[in-house]
């Protein structure tokens, strides 16, 4: 009786991208791709604002879709050539192998990354630089354990680096796009106005009631 139904995904991604001051273009871009049991999440922040910045971040996303099987470090090396004719960008890439319970991470530039395990948050560090401006001599790739109590947040520098995770960021049932939107909302205030394009992308396990 026909092909077997494909299993429900065990991980979800979502995000929000808010252009600075209501601009037509955001210099940020985020995307995710799934292939061969791997889920890869990317966030790119093109240098500056406007269309030229958007072209740089969009070029980064295009490479993710072309080669979703590459490790974070290998994808960033590929981007160094692909972004050479753009302004360049800060880029972070996280790749999740759910079956192995492993998360790989690599980044260049000022993309923030935090991994929650249970109630504990840990920063994932990128190396300084600009993708497309010069080739990185060495590109460290970090490895971390991943389980059903984990959550990954990537964010551009429009979000204050010292933002505090609220209740939404500890939820196991909220859609990741909702979590991202709440993080952006809670991090901005009249005392700390947003001064740049702001993007937050979230990777989370599917809640138990959505699994087969």
Regions found by a protein language model. Give the residues of each.
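Conserved subregion of the PPM/PP2C metallophosphatase catalytic domain
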Residues: 1-212
């Amino acid at each position: 009786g026909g092909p077997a139904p494909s299993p429900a995904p065990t991980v979800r991604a979502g995000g929000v991208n808010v252009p600075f001051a209501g601009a037509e273009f955001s210099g940020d871009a985020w995307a995710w791709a799934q292939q061969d049991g791997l889920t890869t999440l990317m966030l790119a922040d093109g240098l500056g604002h406007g269309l030229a910045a958007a072209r740089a971040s969009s070029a980064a996303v295009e490479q993710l879709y072309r080669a979703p099987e590459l490790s974070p470090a290998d994808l960033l090396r590929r981007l160094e050539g692909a972004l050479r004719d753009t302004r360049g960008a800060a880029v972070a890439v996280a790749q999740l192998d759910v079956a192995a319970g492993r998360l790989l991470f690599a980044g260049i530039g000022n993309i923030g990354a935090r991994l929650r395990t249970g109630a504990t948050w840990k920063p994932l560090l990128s190396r300084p630089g600009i993708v497309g401006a010069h080739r990185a001599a060495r590109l460290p790739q970090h490895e971390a354990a991943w389980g059903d109590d984990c959550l990954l947040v990537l964010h551009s520098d429009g979000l204050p680096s010292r933002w505090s995770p609220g209740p939404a960021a500890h939820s196991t049932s909220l859609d990741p796009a909702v979590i991202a939107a709440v993080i952006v909302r809670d991090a901005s205030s009249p005392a700390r106005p947003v001064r740049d394009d702001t993007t937050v992308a979230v990777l989370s396990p599917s809640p138990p009631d959505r699994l087969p």
